[in-house]
């Protein structure tokens, strides 16, 4: 099968719902992954570690294409990182600014993802390294070299490349045409009709999601995916690493925007998918990286469930109990003892945030670690909701209760309790996605407990949905037979 045929978009299909939890759809997703694993067209065994070997056998631009997907050495020197940046600039300049579209066949069907992934990884690691050198002042020679090259691996340059690839390929217009059941080739143009540009443009959208999330702009991160449908037919779902990355950053963005129900749904999808395909991933190079990310998502979903208690898939719940056990129970219980645990889990599972601007090498004390900054923002949210589980446990026992009486039970001042109740009520109103773009949704009450305060009297009402036993039986019957 040619690259053209493998990367061509489906002609027309109706919009699919992102929240597709039926076992039929899940099994179809797993079967689709099996086909990808066993598909053999002469390039299925080509992976990132063999790209260097391919580069040595080719000439010119073809060698650059393969080399661009090759990971940089873990302890690469600063000069090597500068040279890698220059190589990427040269490659993207040629692809974007040639007199006409570059007519090249890509080395493999997932090459475009490898290039964008490695490009952003090197940008992220360089930014963190530069910030660390500026804060510690441990190597004056390297600090001087970094000071003299502020634009190397600059945020503007990286974003410019990603946006240019998207614009040149007309990929957003193509995706919009697919949604409208129209022919994407009618709007693709000379560049977008070629696999090289179409694939680079498509995965640049996923790259933008990642970069904006690393920069802390979570709303813009989700906005970039407006034209991509989050379902099993999307192109990113054909590449396991891209599939995992997309759902990780979408879920994390939802979590930081306090849309915990959407974050749990997003994380649950990819965790279930990985659990059903892990037997086909073992032995592949990306397996260890995915297993590590899987543990990170388990930590994030534990945090989200502590803020928004909900039923989880049996597989996920078992994974949480096995991985965290008592820690998971402590999170759900809340209170001051849970604070260090929240910070530990967040730091271990969050992206490695970066700063959009170069650090101040002359004033090291002014440089803040972006991870520390976002952790502090997150911990402020934790402190605001730390006593919600305890407060709710008392409220569930009554239909009306005096504010001062409850304050006495909790051993806090009445006005302090009033502020807790207000925060808890505000946090229980969340935007929940149903259809449309990822930022869209309707405001719903995410808690099974509601209350209103009249003077010093608390009026409490509890609405708990019954368990849908029919769905439970159908799911388990399908698994058994």
Curated annotation (Swiss-Prot):
One GO term describing the cellular component: eukaryotic 43S preinitiation complex
One GO BP: formation of cytoplasmic translation initiation complex
Region (Disordered): 1-22
Pfam families for the chain: Paf67 (PF10255)
Subcellular location: Cytoplasm
GO molecular function terms noted in the UniProt entry: translation initiation factor activity
Keywords, alphabetical: Cytoplasm, Initiation factor, Protein biosynthesis
Protein task: Component of the eukaryotic translation initiation factor 3 (eIF-3) complex, which is involved in protein synthesis of a specialized repertoire of mRNAs and, together with other initiation factors, stimulates binding of mRNA and methionyl-tRNAi to the 40S ribosome. The eIF-3 complex specifically targets and initiates translation of a subset of mRNAs involved in cell proliferation.
HAMAP family according to UniProt: eIF3l
Stated family: Belongs to the eIF-3 subunit L family.
Record's subunit section: Component of the eukaryotic translation initiation factor 3 (eIF-3) complex.
Name under which the protein is recorded: Eukaryotic translation initiation factor 3 subunit L
Organism: Coccidioides immitis (strain RS) (Valley fever fungus)
